[in-house]
Amino acid sequence: MGLLPVVGITSPALITHKNHANPKIQRHNQSTSETTVSWTSRINLLTRNGRLAEAAKEFSDMTLAGVEPNHITFIALLSGCGDFTSGSEALGDLLHGYACKLGLDRNHVMVGTAIIGMYSKRGRFKKARLVFDYMEDKNSVTWNTMIDGYMRSGQVDNAAKMFDKMPERDLISWTAMINGFVKKGYQEEALLWFREMQISGVKPDYVAIIAALNACTNLGALSFGLWVHRYVLSQDFKNNVRVSNSLIDLYCRCGCVEFARQVFYNMEKRTVVSWNSVIVGFAANGNAHESLVYFRKMQEKGFKPDAVTFTGALTACSHVGLVEEGLRYFQIMKCDYRISPRIEHYGCLVDLYSRAGRLEDALKLVQSMPMKPNEVVIGSLLAACSNHGNNIVLAERLMKHLTDLNVKSHSNYVILSNMYAADGKWEGASKMRRKMKGLGLKKQPGFSSIEIDDCMHVFMAGDNAHVETTYIREVLELISSDLRLQGCVVETLAGDLLNA
């Protein structure tokens, strides 16, 4: 039976107090406390197994039997309403109403917090905030639930305001903020809060450390990452597998493969994720042969490669032109490990063929893919058309596919425009430029960053936002002058920086 019909049928019972229940039903209720426990136990078991509709039916039968639910009953059901989407919103509202009738939403901190959590997970923050403000007593879990909900939905300012109002901030509060900043792309803020957390005397756990390392990875903040690594060693987190995996990702992203190698070899225990980190990371850094060595060692150690592992192996083959070996790995993945190829695997093969100049093979693969090729796959082949023989005919076909996919990337138009220009077809090049202008496509400005005293300074072309812009320009002019005195020609890029 579906959830909503159950709720619709039993809603009168859900708001019936036990003192007004049917006397005939009440006679069956010989031991209310024991019966409440048994009913709640069944409801909790059903909810934990994802059977929310059956749990709702059980709750309906419980109320019809004249048995009053306790706080554990409400917490179990409210948790289910937050975790499952199909039809649970109406049940959540009814449970909230029933809890209000019993006064549990205001006077029982655990029930009130569960209601807040349910509304937050469903994105109903106005309702969650009303319940929060109405509660007489709040504990740290209540505050943290609101903060976590705000951060999950990207309401960073509201989360920060809630954090500032907290009477006491604990580890979970700080971690929710730091983790939320990372997930929503506020990497620099995450690192600032991580430092503030330590200054405040709260010792980070492995979850907060991983969040900080992820922020360092996304920013390329190697110095701060090294500092976090030293902290990890001093606080005996070095045997935490997840922390070590994050360190490997950080060092590979920053190009420090030797540091990544050291972390990997010092691990007492490794998981598939650990092996994937070095295989993918080394492949991305041009250490393709070593990446494939790790791929073989992984299997020798008894670890079963997964889809991510094969993405790393195929990437490695692509970077060093091992076409036949890459095709062999693709077959091993499908036949030996029964892994259904994803679009990223096909993308690796297209890149493998394209880098080797085998454009016809790459095109045949794209046409035979079981799924619709995306802009990454077609864009890879388009770039290869420029690099291998300036194949304008194929490039035009690929550009039509990208247009059909509604892909509006300036880089694809630039590639085709340059191909026309290289072939002396100036009208075609001009047409591509006009299309770019008509679509409002502009080249995304590149940026560079430098880390000084654990602070990231990011610079973009034409950006004057940095507080030291004037001083930076003066220093850049001095460097350019010295270069000219030494007989060096200042590149256009340097001139652009000065004139930006």
Curated annotation (Swiss-Prot):
Lineage, top ranks: Eukaryota, Viridiplantae, Streptophyta, Embryophyta, Tracheophyta
InterPro entries referenced in this protein's UniProt entry, alphabetically: E_motif, Pentatricopeptide_rpt, PPR_At4g14850-like_plant, TPR-like_helical_dom_sf
UniProt-recorded name of the protein: Pentatricopeptide repeat-containing protein At1g05750, chloroplastic
Cellular component terms (Gene Ontology): chloroplast
NCBIfam families: PPR (TIGR00756)
Single Gene Ontology BP annotation: RNA modification
Residue ranges, annotated region (Type E motif): 377-453
PPR repeat windows: 35-69, 70-106, 108-138, 139-173, 174-204, 205-239, 240-270, 271-305, 306-336, 342-376
Recorded GO MF terms: RNA binding
Primary localization: plastid
Homology family: Belongs to the PPR family. PCMP-E subfamily.
Transit peptide range per the UniProt entry: 1-54
Naturally occurring in which organism (per UniProt): Arabidopsis thaliana
Keyword field contains Transit peptide: yes
Pfam family, any one: PPR
